[in-house]
Amino acid sequence: MQNVASWLLALVVAVVQGELLPGKSAPALLWSYKLSEGIQEYQLAYNMTTVLPAPEFNAIALELLDHCNSHAYVFVNQPGLRLEDFDYEDAWTVLPNYLSRSSSALRFEQVEVSPSNVFENLIAHTKRRCDVQREIILRAEQTNQFEPYIDAQSRIIQVHFSPLPGDGRNERPSREDVLADHDQRLRRILGRLPSPAVTVIYTSLEPADRLSASPPRAGIFPEIFEHESRRIEYERNDRDLQVNRYFPSHHPKMEPIEEVELSLLDPKFIQSNLKLLKLIAVSAIGSLTWQLYSLFSPKLPVATPKGTAKRQKGQKKLVKLATAQAAKQAEEVKLEVSQQEKED
């Protein structure tokens, strides 16, 4: 609040001393994609019916740049720009879009234009404060030939558009057409930057006299700057929020089976599975019958390996005995035959 109080005091002193020259002012827009805390106070304290002194504008711009929260610092000079040019609503399609998406944005309808190039001081300060080593300068037709870059080094970009034509009806192209063309060129420049994190100062270093000496009745883009959300500061572009990770929805290859409670007493179930039920019943009855027969039938001796060996040994003895008896009987028969032959 001390900064705002000192700024208001300097503004009053400048008005009293008559240091603000009527007609030598230009509108100015300042915005940053990331939040620059403390900047919004100047917007709330500003009165658009007064002219903002050049030193105060310079101090506000320096405070905005001191945050060093951007990958590119763009200084746009539109020679001949005046407050009434923002009444051409059809000419401005890009600038309002960038302003509405920015976390910090300021508008000053009337800023005293310093005799010296205010950009020089701001650019030198940015290079030193934010350690920016590279600078790109685009003049007039070069603004339509901006080549994109893909490295991560911060840059200062100066954009100097060609002066705006007069207000005559016979002017070709018209003032509105030139504003619309420059608006699209700015879109191509900002759209080709590798990061949306930019800080932009848009004004005129060569102002034109206002069409009316009366104080402005409407501010620049009131639908943006007079929105209730602009009364508080918050980060509008925080991409590191706790966002739920994406999981694809489940798409089964087969349709889910309907949940149907089956019952043995269901007539449809019995009719469609009659053969299977009969087979189950026959198997169950047969198994029960076998169990009952095994339970009540006389028990037979169970053969063991040892009993089997004894039985085999006894069988061998019987075979040998039978063989011996047969041999003995054969010998006896042989003796009887031989005796009969002798008697004959």
Curated annotation (Swiss-Prot):
The chain crosses the membrane at residues 276-296. It is found in: Endoplasmic reticulum membrane. GO terms for biological process: (1->6)-beta-D-glucan biosynthetic process; cell wall organization; vacuolar proton-transporting V-type ATPase complex assembly. Residues 297-344 are cytoplasmic. Keywords: Cell wall biogenesis/degradation, Endoplasmic reticulum, Glycoprotein, Membrane, Signal, Transmembrane, Transmembrane helix. Residues 19-275 are lumenal. Glycans are attached at N47. One of its GO terms (cellular component) is endoplasmic reticulum membrane. It is a single-pass type I membrane protein. Residues 1-18 form the signal peptide. The keyword Hydrolase does not apply. Required for normal beta-1,6-glucan synthesis. Belongs to the BIG1 family. This is Protein BIG1. The lineage of its organism: Eukaryota, Fungi, Dikarya, Ascomycota, Saccharomycotina. The gene is BIG1.
